[in-house]
Amino acid sequence: MKAGFIAVVGRPNVGKSTLINKLVSEKVAIVSDKAGTTRDNIKGILNFKDNQYIFIDTPGIHKPQHLLGEYMTNIAVKILKDVDIILFLIDASKPIGTGDMFVMDRINENSKKPRILLVNKVDLISDEQKEEKIKEIEEKLGKFDKIIFASGMYSFGISQLLEALDPYLEDGVKYYPDDMYTDMSTYRIITEIVREKILLKTRDEIPHSVAIEIINVERKEGKKDKFDINIYVERDSQKGIIIGKDGKMLKEIGVEARKEIEELLGEKIYLGLWVKVKDDWRKKKPFLKELGYVEE
């Protein structure tokens, strides 16, 4: 038995969460097309051929604009020192930009661990462009212990990735039970489900300005469990967008979130959603701490 912790890093919105969900074959991390979707280090655990791979989905490393962004970048950078392997993800269909190089600089500053580069969406480029991409990688990002190419939906590349990770796993250890695919609590998963539905249904500044908190859980024998959840935004205008005309948007969010939560729990529930305004909450340390977004 071998096991190891693998930090999955990259610029925001490069596809880290999609990769981990695919690897684990479970929905561990929420996914949207909005940058900054992942706010915490989330573990996805894969047991395969007597090996245990613990993939850590990190927030996209970027230059922070507020305390929440600072927290997200700090925990992503900190994990670089603690893992066994760094898995850097880039998009083959896009030029390597300043965001990718910013991530590479943080890796160089904070870790000497083995580095594997996963180049996603290689099915969107030609063989000639693939050769050019390899040269671009060497020029802008430097050397890696291994470079793996994968298709956009990972129809190929996964087995090659696991094979590349194997030599760096630690012998004789196992960190989690075979039936465990994440270390996230059920309540945390529930709040992430609600946030995902908002991300998928709203636009502009809303996705970055939303926080979710379970404020009450009622369990009575013979009755459905009831979850009351606050949705925090920073402006009255944002509150109006989430509620929608005659409450239509909030109802749609609630219906979709409740359905997925019921699938998670295996039982019917009541779900109450309440939209609250907390001015500039992303800049306020006490509130961020209340939500679990400030390191002790």
Swiss-Prot record:
Return the annotated region ranges for G2.
36-40
Instruction: Give a GO biological-process term.
Output: ribosomal small subunit assembly
Which residue range or ranges hold the Era-type G domain?
2-171
Stretches the record annotates as G4:
120-123
* Originating organism: Fusobacterium nucleatum subsp. nucleatum (strain ATCC 25586 / DSM 15643 / BCRC 10681 / CIP 101130 / JCM 8532 / KCTC 2640 / LMG 13131 / VPI 4355)
Q: What is this protein called?
A: GTPase Era
The membrane-topology field of this record reads: Peripheral membrane protein
Subunit structure, briefly?
Monomer.
Please report which protein family the annotation says this sequence is part of.
Belongs to the TRAFAC class TrmE-Era-EngA-EngB-Septin-like GTPase superfamily. Era GTPase family.
Stretches the record annotates as G5: 150-152
What region holds the KH type-2 domain?
A: 202-279
Instruction: Show the Gene3D superfamilies listed in the entry.
Output: 3.30.300.20, P-loop containing nucleotide triphosphate hydrolases
